[in-house]
Regions:
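A short, well-structured juxtamembrane/interface segment
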Residues: 38-56
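Substrate-recognition/cap helix-loop segment adjacent to the acidic, metal-dependent catalytic center
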Residues: 71-84
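Glycine-rich adenosine-cofactor-binding loop
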Residues: 53-71
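Phosphate-bearing ligand-interacting subdomains
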Residues: 102-154
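Short, solvent-exposed loop/turn segments at secondary-structure junctions
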Residues: 6, 66-70, 92, 124-127, ...
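Flexible, glycine-/basic-rich loop-and-beta segments that form/coincide
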Residues: 1-38
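Short, flexible loop segments at boundaries between secondary-structure elements
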Residues: 84-98, 144-154
Length: 154
């Protein structure tokens, strides 16, 4: 960051990023309104699915506790009444709680002890590797829920 007309030359990467942002229409308010509408549609779909699962007396656990999971938990109104605990393989996150919602974060060993019916993947960008690493959960009848970029039950 520098002052306008500063002494530093603008790197070509800055021009590239500005060009990409303009191509993606990031300088238009409508882009963000459309994004918000898409997220709210996913929110409604996920809330309806979670309500249906809970109405069937099925259990739901979260999987993955990245920082972005906090945003998802808040925006999608997910709390301990819906999701009892969050599983994370990172020992540094275990035995802690999710910010604000205070959902316990536990080891993945609990999957095979408590056997939740569904795992809501909160680290959706790692969904493939999470499902691959926990194939046994699926073999035992469990299902994975991937909330974004589009809702998938696998």
């Amino acid at each position: 960051v520098q002052l306008q007309r500063g002494v530093h030359k603008i790197n070509n990467s800055v021009h590239k990023i500005v060009k990409e942002e303009l191509e993606l229409r990031m300088d238009h308010e409508e882009t963000y309104q459309e994004f918000g509408e898409k997220i709210n549609l996913q929110k409604t779909k996920l809330q309806n699915l979670l309500k249906k699962i809970k109405d069937e007396n099925k259990t739901i656990a979260g999987f993955g506790a990245p920082a972005k999971s906090t945003t998802l938990l808040y925006h999608f109104n997910i709390n301990p009444a819906i999701m009892e605990y969050i599983i994370d393989d990172n020992k540094l996150k275990q035995n802690l709680f999710s910010p604000g919602k205070h959902i316990p974060i536990v080891s993945s060993e609990i999957i095979y002890e408590k056997r939740p019916d569904y795992l809501l993947i909160l680290a959706w960008n790692f969904a493939e590797s999470i499902m691959k690493n926990h194939q046994e959960f699926k073999k035992q009848g469990g299902k994975f829920i991937i909330p974004l970029p589009r809702l998938v039950v696998n």
